[in-house]
């Protein structure tokens, strides 16, 4: 699937999404650029049909944390002379598996085998009569598992729940930070993120208020020792020199519609958005952050957000990452008009 592009990708996204993300959305690896899971799932299902000719009833995604939740119910999984438990399987599939398998195809087969063994245990009754509930409930509520149905009536019900991952409700969340690996490497498991969203004072003569977003990223990747296929810089020209363990993160800042950009800095150096547009009823600005191994960088965005006095309570969405994200919302006083 990775080798093919979806020919008619524009049919599955909005015109705003097409303009913001472009034909990157046609590639499987980039079908998660939007934080709106139904958008991503429609693209994935369409690509699978293009490749195989078969339609699917739905799309289910899990990450390493969901796998750990499941293994907590199934019990340990034996793989490649290792005993993987709920305590170590997340680190294994995001880091250690690359040491066991230098060949990326063999690595992919190993990870798929782990997932298959886990689901086979669940189907076999591991965890007792409520095993599936115990395995699925935690990731469904933490964002580690997402579900989409091709049947519109079923999808309508799913999209109203947390597991649906829909951004149709503009009141929840009001803002979001989306990280995308712009280098095309395997270093996400070494990236930690902390986000602070703060509301400031209300404007006296206009229906706006000050607002700020602070995003700090740390790259904890080692400077040596990782397999070459973990550390490439596919964003750079062929033959370009770069530090092993370095990466580039694309930061998409989603804020309430009508917000006006004021200024931004990366490590206190002024920057402007690389791109801007709209996605699921929110204003979006993109910033690119270069990170050397064992380094950090801070993006600070100042903007004006609409404040007419009837806005929803501010909330912030961040995606599930291998390293837990620290997210803080500082709510300002309600503006009176």
Where are these regions (language model features)?
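Non-catalytic, solvent-exposed segments at the cell envelope interface
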Residues: 1-326, 335-337
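Flexible helix-coil linker/hinge segments at domain or subdomain boundaries
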Residues: 328-330
């Amino acid at each position: 699937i990775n080798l093919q592009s979806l020919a008619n990708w524009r049919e599955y996204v909005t015109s705003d999404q097409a303009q913001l993300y472009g034909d990157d959305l046609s590639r499987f690896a980039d079908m998660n650029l939007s934080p709106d899971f139904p958008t991503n799932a429609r693209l994935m299902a369409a690509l699978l049909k293009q490749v195989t000719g078969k339609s699917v009833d739905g799309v289910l995604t899990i990450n390493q944390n969901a796998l750990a939740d499941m293994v907590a119910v199934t019990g340990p999984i034996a793989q490649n002379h290792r005993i993987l438990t709920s305590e170590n399987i997340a680190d294994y599939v995001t880091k250690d598996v690359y040491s066991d398998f230098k060949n990326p195809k063999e690595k992919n087969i190993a990870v798929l085998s782990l997932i298959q063994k886990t689901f086979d245990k669940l189907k076999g009754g591991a965890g007792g009569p409520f095993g599936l509930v115990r395995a699925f409930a935690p990731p469904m509520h933490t964002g580690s598992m997402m579900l989409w149905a091709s049947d519109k009536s079923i999808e309508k019900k799913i999209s109203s729940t947390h597991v649906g991952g829909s951004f149709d409700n503009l009141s929840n969340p009001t803002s979001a930070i989306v990280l995308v690996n712009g280098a095309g490497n395997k270093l996400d498991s070494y990236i930690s993120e902390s986000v602070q969203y703060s509301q400031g004072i209300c404007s006296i003569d206009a229906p706006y208020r000050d607002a700020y977003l602070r995003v700090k990223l740390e790259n904890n990747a080692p400077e040596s020792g990782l397999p070459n296929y973990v550390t490439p810089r596919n964003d750079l020209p062929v033959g370009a020199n770069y530090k092993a363990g370095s990466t580039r993160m694309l930061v998409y800042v989603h804020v309430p519609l009508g917000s006006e950009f004021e200024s931004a800095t990366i490590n206190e150096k002024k920057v402007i958005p690389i791109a801007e547009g709209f996605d699921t009823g929110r204003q979006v600005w993109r910033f690119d952050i270069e990170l050397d191994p064992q380094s950090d960088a801070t993006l600070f965005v100042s903007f004006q957000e609409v404040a007419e006095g009837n806005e929803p309570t501010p909330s912030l969405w961040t995606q599930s990452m291998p390293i837990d994200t620290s997210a803080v919302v500082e709510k300002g006083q309600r503006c009176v008009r």
